[in-house]
Every structure is written in C-alpha cells, then in structure tokens.
C-alpha cells in the first residue's frame, strides 16, 4: 500500500453493479461480457436507492462496462463520473458465460476450486495480476481526490474484492458483495501508520 493516499483521509463507497441476467443465472460474467442490467436488477437498485442505502458522494468513479455505467446513472443520476481504464472485471477465460452446474466435472475447474481460486483462469487472468491492475487504478483515484472526500466507486465484484483485500490484508473472498450492495471503506492516518476501517454498506 505504499503511498496509497499520501496520508490523506478519505471515505470510499464501493458498490457492486446491479444484477444482469447472467448474474441471476449464476454464470461467470467477466471481462469478455458487456451485458447490461436486467429489469430485475434495475428495479432492485431503484428500491435500494429509495430506501436510502446509498450515501451522497463528492466524486464518482465506475467500471467501463454497461452494467457499471447503468448502475451509476440509476443510483447517482446527473452526477459526473470518471471511468478508470483499469476498472474491469477479471478475465474468466474458458469459464466465461458458464455456470457452476455447467462446469461440474471440468478438470480445470476442479483444479481452480481446489486452489482456493488462486490458479489463473484457463486462457484468462490470474488473481495476482488482476489485483495489481485494480490497485493501479485505485492509486490513481486516491491521488486525484482531495482530502476528506467521500468517493463513490461503482465496480465489478472482482474489483471490489481485489482492492479491499489488498488494502486491508484480509482474504480476497472476504469481500464478496451482492449486486447493488457493497462496503464503506474509511482510510486515515499519516506517513507512519495507515488505518483502514471497512463496514458493509447499509
């Protein structure tokens, strides 16, 4: 986390994009897919917004895919947003578009499961390289925003897991957010000690 915030104090609101049809079908929907939100996903976001789940933000960033941009426009209509080029979902490779049921019996999938998700996806990305890429994008955001800002980040589940596990030192799968849900991450301290407090959104 060297120099992540240059001793700045900020609050980051991480929100996973709303549901797509593939999400509801429990399929791997990654970098290769630019699927937009389904009606059920849109309606769920609107309901959560009306219930006051999403706090106001000073700055807004979102992933490049339609599902992230549509989510940003539903939750924060009219708010300017920036799209960091790094913020994409992981490349699931041969698992893209397939469900757990469809992958049962696939030896490559079994090996990946047994590794705890640490093996690279066949013909896709490794978790290690993906985390590095996501942290590069997060560093840019952290440098860009002024101190004491509340920063919205609407992204993919993988992006959220990568960043929060890297800055907290906890496990990658400790930060699995449901669609439309997420985490509030407060980062504060000085050049000697960086503190990170993460709570579930809502």
Ranges and model annotations:
Residues 12, 149-157:
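Generic beta-sheet signal
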Residues 17, 79-86, 171-180:
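Short hydrophobic/aromatic-enriched beta-strand-loop microsegments
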Residues 20, 159-160:
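Short active-site segment of divalent metal-dependent hydrolases/proteases
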Residues 35-36, 75-133:
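Phosphate-handling substructures
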Residues 52-56, 141-149:
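Glycine-rich phosphate-binding loop signature in dinucleotide/nucleotide-binding domains
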Residues 62-63, 132, 154-155:
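Short beta-strand scaffold positions
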Residues 168-195:
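Domain-level recognition of soluble alpha/beta enzyme cores
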